[in-house]
Structures are given as C-alpha cells and as structure tokens.
Amino acid sequence: MVKSEINNNGGEPVFAVLTQYLKDFSFENPSAPRSLRPREKAPQIDININVNANPIGDDNYDVVLSLSVKANDNNETLFHVELIYGGVFHIKDIPQEHIMPLVFIECPRLLFPFARQIISDATQNGGFPPLWIDPIDFAALFQKRVAEEQKNSQTQPS
C-alpha cells in the first residue's frame, strides 16, 4: 500500500492523549452505617455506561466516559456512584472513516482503567469491598450507537 493511501495529508498519523480529567464525581452511601453490615448474598449491581465526544479545536476531541453504579439489596440502596471522566485526544492525519471508531472505542478504552480505579477506591473508602468493574466492550457499544443512529435517521420524516 502506498503511504499516501494510508492518510489524507501525507503526514504521519497521530493519536495522543493530551490530558485526562475528573469532571464530576458523587458517592452516596444513604443507609450508612446500616448498609455496611455483613450480607448473606452479594447485592444487585447495576452499571450504566455512556460515551460522548465533541471536537474541540483543530484535530482535538473531548471524550467523556459517564458511569453510574448502584448497589441494591432488596429495596435498600447500599451505594450509588456517579462518575464523569474525560480526556482530550489529539487525532491527526487519520482517514475520516477511522475517526469515529477511534474516538468512541479506543479513547474510552484508554480512559476506562482510570475511571474503574476511582470507582473501586470510592466503594472501598465508603466501607464496602472494592468494586472492580469488568472490562467493557466499547466496540459493541459503538456498534449499538451506530445502529440506533441509523434506525433514528430512517424513522424521522424528511
């Protein structure tokens, strides 16, 4: 393959993390200290994940990973964690068709271990065992997002 076919401008492809940041964080332990007693079974853990991205300036993207984690035992909320963790990525000289997968798959994949650690530390500091969230398939989330966008564009009147 000729190098000019790999990228648009003839420059070397660039993918770099410029910064990472904690945008918003909340840990609620509404039933403490009652919620900290030993339990016979593991609580129900509900995890919601969302990825958003916006271009900011030339070749830079702000990618935000939002996580909401709730632990419930019967009707009692044990804890609720909300985290918005972001990063600014510099993406240059990469073919246009690869930008969105890079932004919505690879960028959150790089952010996730840091967000996971924050949630683990918060649950442990809240008096619970550390919660280690399983790895997330960001490719599947991206495919689902694309399918929903296509479905919505087909159902909207012209």
Swiss-Prot record:
Signal peptide (from-to): none
InterPro entries cross-referenced by the UniProt entry: SecB (IPR003708), SecB-like_sf (IPR035958)
An MF annotation (GO) of this entry: unfolded protein binding
Disulfide bonds: none
SUPFAM superfamilies, per database record: SecB-like (SSF54611)
Keyword Kinase belongs to the record: no
Keyword entries, A-Z: Chaperone, Cytoplasm, Protein transport, Translocation, Transport
Tagged with keyword Protein transport: yes
A single cellular component GO annotation: cytoplasm
Family the UniProt entry places it in: Belongs to the SecB family.
PANTHER family: PROTEIN-EXPORT PROTEIN SECB, PTHR36918
Protein task: One of the proteins required for the normal export of preproteins out of the cell cytoplasm. It is a molecular chaperone that binds to a subset of precursor proteins, maintaining them in a translocation-competent state. It also specifically binds to its receptor SecA.
Protein name, UniProt field: Protein-export protein SecB
Source species: Bartonella quintana (strain Toulouse) (Rochalimaea quintana)
The organism's taxonomic lineage, starting at the top: Bacteria, Pseudomonadati, Pseudomonadota, Alphaproteobacteria, Hyphomicrobiales
